[in-house]
Structures are given as C-alpha cells and as structure tokens.
Amino acid sequence: MNRPVGTATRGTTNPNRLRRMDRWIAHAHGPALRRSDPAPVAVDLGYGAAPWTAVELLRRLRTADPRCEVVGIEIAPARVAAAEPYEREGLTFRHGGFEVPTAERPALIRAANVLRQYDEDEVAAVWARLCDRLAPGGLLVEGTCDEIGRRHVWVALGPEGPRTVTFATRLGSLERPSDLAERLPKALIHRNVPGEPVHAFLRDFDRAWAAAAPYASLGARQRWIKAVADLAGAWPLTDDRRRWRQGEVTVEWAALAPSRG
C-alpha cells in the first residue's frame, strides 16, 4: 500500500466551523452537482480530530442534491478510526492524503485549514495535484477560517486552476474588512504587503467600509452591502447582493493573484 501524500495537521476542529464555506459551495456548485452522472462524490480532505465537518458537509450538500455522497479523508489513521462509528448511508471515512484515494473522481474536494500549515512554495503543487483528481466540472475549495467559523477566506479552483477568492464573515464581529487578512489562505497570506494585489484590495475595501459608515445606523449588513457595491466599481466581483447579504464577497482570482517574484 502506498504511503499517503502529505503530513498530519494539528487536527483542530469544531462543530459548525465550516458553515459559511458549506453554504457557499451548496449555492455556487449546486447546479454542477445536480448535473453529475453518476451521483456526485465530495471529499472532506483533512477533516481533523473529529468528523463533525464531514457529517455537516453531507447534510448541507444534500440540500443541493440528495444523491451526494461524502468521503472524509485523513492522513492520521487514529482519526479515521475515531470517525468510523459516524459512518452512515452516503458518508464514509478513509485513510489518505493529497492523492485523494477515492474510486471515483470527486465532484468536490474541500480542504479547509490544511494548507495553512504548509509552506507557501508548496501550495501550487498541491493545488495541481488535487485539481488533477477532480471529475469534469469538479471544484476544489481551499481556505482558512478561525476556530469557530466567524471569519473565512477561500479559493475556488476548477480543473484548469484557481478561479475566485471568497471573503466571508459574521458581520457583527467585524471592525473593518481587513480583519479578514489573518484568515487569508496560504497562497495569499504572506502577500498582504504593499505592492501586492490582495493588499490593494483590502486597502480599498477598508476605504469603502469607512465611506459607508453612515449606513451603520441601519446595521452591519447594510453597511457591508454598500461598501461592497462601491468596491464593485474598481474590482471584478463575481457575486451579487444576495450573497453580499450573507456577509460574503467573491473576487476573480486573477485580480488578487500574487505578483511574480
């Protein structure tokens, strides 16, 4: 048996931690899941010391397509053994890593709080390896969140590579949009410096947020919507007010991609 690819992470997890990412996936990728033939398989890669996120992913994806199946993959055998009592129809757990040892090519791979523990120069190769495992029309979602899921940033990738970056937050916890910088995924977190696109984006977002201060009397949601609407004049956003109301904003990857060098 080949050794799994990758190294064990800290395994930190909490119930409902990935709710923002899950809801976005069900919305953005739901149509592709429903078109999948055979039934779509989703992978929760590196689910951690307890299986909560895989259990929740199955429940949320089945609101988009009741045929969905979820495979939780962990590189630590003890974590797989601890998760097995939670197996049920549509939910299994498997020992593995970035090779993604599933019989079928997944329609979705979710890797949350995994690559944050790797070096930046390792990210591109891991992305490429995971994207190579996707089914046609599949999606890789890779990102980072805080311990209870209030702040989250992720990259969505297709078989061809990165497509978008999504920022999502519990608006009541936010002082300014750049607070999300500490949750940038590994490909971007060290690029939040002057001269880099992601730094310019967060700078402009903070300025739009400050300009929208009069809307704070209507609530944090209305202030966020106004700030994002203003931001859309200068940055290629891919979503609309329905998602902004959820405390989200999604930007084309090309606009935030790291500068060369």
What positions do the PLM features span?
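Class I SAM-dependent methyltransferase Rossmann-like catalytic core
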Residues: M1-P40, D44, A49-P51
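A general structural motif
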Residues: D37-A39, R67, R105-P106, G137
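Conserved beta-strand signature within the Rossmann-like core of class I S-adenosyl-L-methionine
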Residues: L134-G149
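A short SAM/SAH-binding and catalytic strip from SAM-dependent methyltransferases
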Residues: P106-A124
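Class I SAM-dependent methyltransferase SAM/SAH-binding core
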Residues: V43, G48-P101
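Conserved Class I S-adenosyl-L-methionine
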Residues: H199-G261
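A short glycine-rich, Lys/Arg-flanked "PGG" loop and its adjoining helix->strand segment in the class I
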Residues: R116, A124-P136
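A conserved mid-domain beta-alpha-beta active-site/ligand-binding segment of alpha/beta enzyme cores
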Residues: V153-R223
